[in-house]
Structure formats: C-alpha cells, structure tokens
Amino acid sequence: MGPEDFAYQLPDAAIAQVPLEDRPAARLLDAVGDRVVHRTVRDLPSLVGPGDVLVVNDTRVLPARLRLRRRTGGSAEVLLLRTLEGDGTWEALVRPSRKLPEGTTLAVDDDLSVEVGRDLGDGRRHVRLLCSGPVLEAVHRCGEMPLPPYLTTVLEDPDRYQTVYSRRSASAAAPTAGLHLTEQVLDACRAGGVRIESLELVVGLDTFRPITVDDLDEHRMHREDYCVPATTLEACRDASRVIAVGTTTVRALESAARYGAEGRTDLFIRPPFDFRVVDVLLTNFHQPRSSLLVMLEAFAGPRWRELYGTALADGYRFLSFGDAMLVGRARPDRSGA
C-alpha cells in the first residue's frame, strides 16, 4: 500500500479559502449509518445522546511564523514548532536553512532576534529567541498565523483559525474539525446528555505534509506532544460511544491507550489498526496522499472514497476551512470470506 492508493482529484474550486461567518452552518456529511445524510454541523446535538462522550483538542495555534532580516542583507523565515528550554530555545523550521550557519543572528524587530543553532535535518534547526521581556509576549506581538500553503486568501480575523475552546498557544496548525463548533452547539450537546471532554495534542507540520515515500512502511511521522487528562480517560472508559473531534484527537486518544496519558507520539495510524478508544469521528475533508487519509481508511475502511466522491459531486468545501464528515468506525469482517 502506497500514497497513490490515497490519491484523488481535488479541484482548486473545492478548496475553501475563507471560513464561514456562521461556524456551525458548515455542511456535515453524516455517514455514521449505512445511509448518507446531508446535514449541517448545527444538527450535531441531534446525532449524539446520553452516554456519548465528545472529545476535543483544546490546543491553540501560536502565531509562530517570524519574518526576519539578516544583518548582511536579505530575508529569512522561522516557523516555531515547539519550545525546548525555558531559556527561549525552540525547534523550528528555518528558511533558507542551508545558507544560515550555526550562530547566525536574525532580527525580527528592535527588541526580538533569533539565533540559529544546531541543524536537525529536513530544514529544522534549534533556534534561540532573544528579547528583553517574556518570549511568548514577543512572539504574539511579532508573529503571524502559520496558515496552510493551500490558503491563498488573506485571513481578516486570525481568531477564525482558532477553536472557541482553545487554551494554550503551542500548535503550528489548528485542529480544524473543531473550527465548526460553538459554545451554543456544545451546550446543546450537553443538554442532551453528552459529556464534553478535552485533551491537548500540539499539532505539528505533518498536517500539511504529503506522503512522499512509495511504501507506507517507510513513512515516518514527526513526534507531537500530547496530554490526556485522567478525567477524559475515565469518561472514555465509561462511554457508550467516544466521538473524537478531529484526527488529532484520535491520535492523542489512541496514543494514550498504548503509551500512557502524556508524552510525545509518532503514532502512524494506518490499516490495519486496532482502535481501542474512538468509535465515531468528526473530521474535515483532507488532502490527497496525506497521512490523514490513511488514518481515515484505517478507521472507516475504503468507504471513504465513495464518501469523498459524493461530497465533491454535491459541492462540499474541502480542507481546513471546509465542511465536515461524521463517520463511524468500520467493523471487522468476520464472515471468513
């Protein structure tokens, strides 16, 4: 099995460039049962009920893209991926990495500069942020939202690339399935007997990275930090159904079931996969040849191809600011055929 097994034709016109003003007005392809029903996310409370646990990833996107100038002239760019030390050291994607020797200092403004450190390969470097005050305050002041490369329209309101329940600024990308939810939708779910729980998985760049190897056995996921609180784990154990909002939530829950409630995970969810926690997935429509589609096949089976065809034919909007799908976990075929 290789990346070509997860290829499909995605027209540019199907890629949503801007978010909807009304978040839950996004369309929802309800494929939990055998019959596909066209709904909106606002219908979600009617599709869940007592005993269900809805789990969200409450990470917040850090405005982590820093545009810098070199003292010798020219420009550079740093995308902060994760903090390493309390002294302002980060792992970052640096461009142009090969032209910046270790020890090079780049200026963001008069107060914030970046010292380029060890080469980690793949364009990644250790960098140290130097400023007179708190580092995160400087990043929020100077940084830009690291939007996916397929979004070419200027985002007028950066908060539209944040979930309404986001907390700690740490991620390089949003857990986009959660962008559709509002407090009103979540309150309606609670009123119907649904328990809402949260976890944190710090989303990295694998969200945007296509699979480039010919064999999935050779694909390696970058590690991401995650933490699943004890209350979330307990709720999932007692749930009638665990409904994960987004692929990052799936990755965190299934990592916790294997490796413990907190840590760094490089779990690559691919067929065949033994899901131990998640029963239903709320997810956006993903890029061709991506690890997220591989996860979707592991979860829902090859049916996703038919569902994507239906969505494209019916004018659904795809990718980060696009519409959503609700799908149940495929059951093992025990027919012996």
Language-model-detected regions and their locations in the chain:
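Surface-exposed, charge/polar-rich loops and edge strands
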Residues: M1-A337
